[in-house]
Amino acid sequence: MNNKKSKDPIQKYPIPPFPKQPQDVPGITSKMNPLPDHGEQSYVGRGLLKDAVCIITGGDSGIGKAVAIAMAREGAKIVISYKDKVEDEDAKDTLDWIEKAGSEGILIRGDIRNEKQCLKIVEKTISKYGRIDILVNNAAYQMTYNSIEEIDTIEWDKTFDTNIRAMF
């Protein structure tokens, strides 16, 4: 049993309002204020996914990074798919946390809106690990607008190609 005293979850994390985050999309974790909590210091695994092979799209940051760290601490091998060179720092940091968990992983950069990129992710995973056990379709894209009428066709296509089409 864990004898650590629990902290009130309402006071455990930063409370809004947060400062403006002047970043282009995709954002970089190290430039966020406050820094997000991906479970780096808190999640304790129990080996529930020992030797499972997991692909996580968008696994370099945000929810994808938290999932990657948790699955690695559960014993899984992690394949992180992420989109742009600008995300290399976040992806490398996530891989470092995977390795600190005693697991291993690979990074695959490329846009999953491109079907050939999706095939490349599968091929590299099979080549390295021989199988795929878990797929986490986490990568997503969305911009906010005051009205749906403001969304042009290019924006609509980018959103659906990332969030829906890439999964198939």
What annotation goes with each model-predicted range?
Residues 1-50:
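Non-catalytic terminal and boundary segments that flank Rossmann-like NAD(P)-dependent oxidoreductase
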Residues 41, 142-147:
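Helix N-cap/beta-alpha junction loops of NAD(P)-dependent oxidoreductase domains
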Residues 46-80:
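Canonical Rossmann dinucleotide-binding motif of NAD(H)/NADP(H)-dependent dehydrogenases/reductases
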Residues 55, 79, 106-108, 135, ...:
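Conserved Rossmann-like nucleotide-binding pocket used by diverse enzymes
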Residues 76-93:
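Conserved glycine-rich Rossmann-like NAD(P)H-binding loop of the short-chain dehydrogenase/reductase
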Residues 88, 108-121, 153:
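The beta1-alpha1 cofactor-binding region of Rossmann-like NAD(H)/NADP(H)-dependent oxidoreductases
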Residues 101-104, 124-137, 143-144, 155:
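A glycine-rich helix->loop->beta "capping" turn
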Residues 133, 141, 149-168:
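Catalytic Tyr-X3-Lys loop
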